Amino acid sequence: MVNIYDNANQLAKDLQETEQFKDLKKSLENLKNNPESLDLYQRMDKLQQQILAAQNSGQPLSEEAQKEYQKINEEVRNNDELKDMITKEQALFQMINDVQQAMTKPIGDLYDDLKAK
């Protein structure tokens, strides 16, 4: 019998050996070593948490939060460390998405006979 959890744990270890993971790790180290970029990241993260909380509670985003969001987005577009981190993060998540699609394909295949032809 297959222990799928062992495979998942091995996949997590293998993930850490990919170029995409290593590139993101290096990018995050560069970001941490730049106080200005780190501060911007932390402000962006805090605002994203506030936006998510507002959305989850059905509250509209305040005008002040909208302006802050626009301001931070502009700063991010002009920050090389954050732009690099976002690019590396997107590459890693694209790979993870590809793996997830491969893993879930057999589930979709189970339903193929049920689909209208």
UniProtKB/Swiss-Prot annotation:
UniProt xrefs under InterPro entries: Com_YlbF, YheA/YmcA-like_dom_sf
Family annotation (Pfam families): Com_YlbF
Family designation: Belongs to the UPF0342 family.
Name assigned to this protein: UPF0342 protein LJ_1677
Species of origin: Lactobacillus johnsonii (strain CNCM I-12250 / La1 / NCC 533)
